[in-house]
Amino acid sequence: MAGLQSLWTDNKSNNRITSGVAGVLGDMLADAGVAKKLYNDGWLPRMVSILQYEECRDCALEALSRFVGHNFPDICKDVSTNHFQKISQVFFDVDTDTEDSAQAVRIMAKALMPTLGSIETPKLITIFDRNKIKIKKILDRLMEKLENPLPPHSPTSTCHEIDLAIGLAYLSPDLVLSTLRYLQCFVACLRSSCMKVRAKGTRIIYDLCVGRAGRPKPNNMQQIANAWMKGYPPEIDTLIRDYGEDRCHASEGINGLTAFQEVVADRTIDLDFYKFGLAIGQAMLETDYAVFKLPFERRSSKYPFNTWLDALPHTANVLRSNAEFDKADIIEAKYLMVTGKWMAAKDLAEKASKRSPKIGFWYYAMCIPMEDADSLRTAQKGLRCPGLSLYVRHGLLYQASTRAWELALKALTGPSPSDQLWSQGLAYLGLCYQNLKTILTISPPDSVGIASLANLFVLAHILLHGPELSPNLEESKPIVEKARLITKLNDLIWAEELASAPIASQMAREIILKHLVSVSESRSAFIQHTDSCAWAEQERGDDAKQPTTEEVSKLFEGASISSSSEDPKRSKYKFFGTERQEIHLYQCSWCHNPSAVLRKCGVCGQACYCDQQCQKLHWKEHKTVCKSPEISK
């Protein structure tokens, strides 16, 4: 090391020697431990400093590529925040079809993507602005590179070009959303035969729309009722009649208010909180509109309540004193949810679920404030409970499908297809797709969050099918039309608010459908790039299998499929880079939650479970196959 240091210091102006030093460093940097030491000794900025000299550039780029290739967070952050501008200048100075161009892109992409996860985006945007990094110029150059025929060098360059374009899009969302050329590039990803490319294109479009629109907010009863009383246009009336007007959310809310008023009228006379609790405790399992803020007309020092909603904690205590523990906990949990105390509701429901594990409401209350993976697992457990009301089933399916969507996008845009997380991501995506299909079949068209889910189903459908979709998307028209109608109904409900807060999944759906047909031809060269990129080759490995929709769907029967009385005929799509048995290995045998950390049955070694509770709930069914006289520990 000291010899290289001396050689560099004594010959800074001799490009032939500095180039030789850079070449030696490039070989040494193959070792991660040595790379870390060389970085600490200050060699990274030295390599950047000689990029301006053409005779040194090849070796310097190779050394920098090795530096970032080890994915050390501090090295990637250093390159992104201090040296990105000079590396991007190389990208501008050389022809796009050269190896130097590919190396510059690789360095920027490998440095930027990890940095996006370690620095808050607004802070990184400020750093890029301060360093005068020309994001638009880089993106335009990338588009030029991706639109040309595939160059002869390594196909990994396409992967890095896509990653760099995505990373820069996060730093310039307004620019990307307003520039047709960039949007079409990301939409064209959805025509690729490579699942990872499709997932990356879908995720960046969806994330940009979430940033612009914000997360979806649920409808409230007042807005639904107001829109219902004003009346709907003919095509929306048809949508509602086809489902059943008396089964829709508006009717449910109005009927719930009427029923609650009748209960309150009786209990205002006798103040029998036990009877009040029995009535609304059952109603809370059936509808989201079981209790309203009606005035409590007999307020006193003993009953200091302004509304009947305020009386719910007291009602729960009265029920407990009469050994009605389940209804008491339902009422208190619902009160905590209505008042925004989600974690307290979760904790209460978690304790109650140990006493009565087959009440689906507990899992609904628990899953809302949880992180994605825990929420999905909990929702899937709830969907296995018997006798679920449509209200609870809808809530569980909403959480399960949206959380599975987020987890699928994360898993399918990160690891290699040989990684366990990749198989888990495919399972998440399949589960999301089936749950969305189910909820759109069973739920009213004006139900909570349904517009977001209808548009999300279109995104999941396109992500799954990709290049198999016909050029004019003919087979997709029924689900697209349903999403359009439900979205129009949602627009009528949220008439004023939507002017400033559109639905993210709707924005993404409109962007994708606007360009998906045309990019098949206009971006054919880019699509060919993606079909032969390194990710695609990994997915098409010698040991890779391509399960059909029917095979993958079998993995999720019981949780989502059984939530519907009918199981519609499924179309075919392909998952690349995994085997059916490999997906099954990461799925709970009871609740069907995808996970890479499961406990196996100690007897047969085939069944896998999230935890002991799932194992116990599955035992009655599993013991006939397992042949064990008692549950394994």
Q: Positions of the model-derived regions?
A:
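Alpha-helix N-cap/helix-start positions at coil->helix boundaries
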Residues: 15-16, 54-58, 97-102, 152-156, ...
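Amphipathic alpha-helical repeat scaffolds of TPR domains
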Residues: 58, 62, 102-120, 155-163, ...
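Short alpha-helical interaction motifs and adjacent low-complexity tails used for partner binding
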Residues: 3-6, 21, 147-151, 185, ...
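Short, hydrophobic/charged alpha-helical patches characteristic of ARM/HEAT alpha-solenoid repeats
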Residues: 1, 34-41, 73-82, 120-140, ...
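Alpha-helical solenoid repeat architecture
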Residues: 6, 16-33, 49, 58-73, ...
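Solenoid-like repeat scaffolds
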Residues: 10, 49-53, 92-96, 148-151, ...
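Buried hydrophobic core positions in alpha-solenoid tandem helical repeats
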Residues: 1-8, 43-49, 83-91, 131-147, ...
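Non-catalytic protein-protein interaction scaffold segments in large eukaryotic complex-forming proteins
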Residues: 131-265
